[in-house]
Amino acid sequence: MSDAATRAEETSEGHSSSAIGLMVGAVGVCYGDIGTSPLYTLKEVFIGGYGVQANHDGVLGVLSLIFWSLVWVVSIKYVIFVLRADNQGEGGVMALSALARRAAAPFGRLQTFVVVAGLIGAALFYGDSMITPAISVLSAVEGLEIAFDGLEHWTVPLALIVLIGLFLIQKHGTARIGILFGPVMVLWFGALAALGVYGVIQQPEVLQAMNPVWAVRFFGSHPGIGVAILGATVLALTGAEALYADMGHFGRKPIARAWFLLVLPALVLNYFGQGATILSNAEAARNPFYLLAPGWALLPMVALSTLATVIASQAVISGAFSLTRQAIQLGYVPRMTIQHTSSHEQGQIYIGGVNWALMVGVVLLVLGFESSASLAAAYGVAVTGTMLITTLLMGVVIWRLWKWPLWLGVPFFCVMLAVDSLFFAANLPKVIQGGAFPVIAGIVIFILMSTWKRGRQLLVERLDEGSLPLSVFISSMRVQPPHRVQGTAVFLTARTDAVPHALLHNLLHNQVLHEQVVLLTVVNEDSPRVPPDRRFEVEAYGDGFFRVILHFGFMEEPDIPAALRLCHLNELDFSPMRTTYFLSRETVIPSKRIGMARWREGLFAFLLKNANGNLRYFNLPLNRVIELGTQVEI
């Protein structure tokens, strides 16, 4: 064999092993949530009080609904289309919102709608982030009730031990054990498929459910509960949004390949196997997943299920951290301390406030609902709400960004909207039955995010009212030049045409200016990352005054000193011991001025007081920072 052929073969093998590695990684991170849905979906359908009979027509009808829901919602909508709506490789409701906002830029009202829709989607995701760990781990531990009599009272304590332990280790990171997530989940899906084949062999007639006629016939024979049952079958779709949210880690192709080659076949086989078990014994509907397993495999499946649900919960928690970082960068959430838990993976982060809030919510859910069957009632609202928001934002992308022809875009969008609206409507009655929790959590988080965003806008407007134009200030410095001291002073400001308040206060009290005065503005872009050649803009005004604008993406850490060192301008010296950073810290005073309701102004003042300041957020050196305070009425 020639050297060229050998190198080509090695390259091919390298690409092949890399592709397989990405697929395995995607299975471990992206598919944990939807992969653990078989633990509770069919159980909820048949014992959740919907009135579905565990007979031949009922089982085949439900299986057909689940199968075609997986095909349309996950395979067609998410894997084939939504994954293509990446924001420079990043996905998720925040990234999609930023993408749609750029596309809707010429239309003010549409842009406002996109912002509000993105905030609602993000708020519902946080509610989902609490429910997923609770219902997944509870459903896994409940398998012990099948294996051993009298363990019902131990289900909740065991689930709490697992969940609290999971949240406690977040601060230390999961880099070391994270490499096992993919192989464990591959083993999990292999077990799902094997159990499914075991069940289908006993009742091959369940394969008839692939015919959509059974789903249509089910609606026809159950006119009273046909739509309501969608509220239970949607549990099979939980985690579909995670495929899109985690796209930045693996890319579209590995996620799509993992779905079609492993995850979808394993899920379909397992659901059909559970259906076969119910056809053989209607009593198996009380927990068809575990009763599908042979007796000798029950305890191993409980152990594997617990591992799989922990991995699924970890993926959701990590997703909440990532979403929070994006929201902070886009200006929707107060600044928090972000801790990196891995020196190799930039995306592995820890946000203490989010972690403890999620833990409290999860513990309250487990204590309040006590079983996966009870908790299933609260699950669908957040899931279908987020799916509906994604469809609405996708409509903007299809129209304004992809510019599909109307004859193609309108029918496709209408079908997506109709399906998601049907699922969402089917879950609305759950608000009364226990589904109020994610709705309340979503409302609270939406109020917090919208109040912070609006409060920041009002704060900038109030500061602008008393601002001095930069050109006037520089002209006055030429007429009456103050004493200049050595070094570089960097003043952070949101305005590019006005004098920062910190500069005016410093000049008023100290009567001096540095040799070099830099007015620095940080701009957070709607894209995930900014290339080095677009990182900064520099403008020299003369007399030692400079304007610098730094650009950061919503997936980047805004390190100002590191960015300024790349500012190649001979006149500027940003050496650490010659540079002083001046910050302005505002204290907000609620007033009767037109802006927000007084209670929202008070809430914003509280959030601003407890938010991390610019010092930590921008990685400024502690011994080179001077903060100057000012009071502002909003």
UniProtKB/Swiss-Prot annotation:
Chemical reaction(s) catalysed: K(+)(in) + H(+)(in) = K(+)(out) + H(+)(out)
Single Gene Ontology MF annotation: potassium ion transmembrane transporter activity
Record has Transmembrane helix as a keyword: yes
Bilayer topology annotation: Multi-pass membrane protein
UniProt cross-references to InterPro entries, sorted A to Z: K+_transporter, K_trans_C, K_trans_N, Kup
Location in or out of the cell: Cell inner membrane
A single Gene Ontology CC term: plasma membrane
Keywords from the UniProt entry: Cell inner membrane, Cell membrane, Ion transport, Membrane, Potassium, Potassium transport, Symport, Transmembrane, Transmembrane helix, Transport
Transmembrane segments: 19-39, 62-82, 113-133, 150-170, 177-197, 225-245, 259-279, 291-311, 349-369, 379-399, 406-426, 431-451
Entry's family note: Belongs to the HAK/KUP transporter (TC 2.A.72) family.
Its biological purpose: Transport of potassium into the cell. Likely operates as a K(+):H(+) symporter.
Protein name: Probable potassium transport system protein Kup
Organism the protein comes from: Pseudomonas aeruginosa (strain UCBPP-PA14)
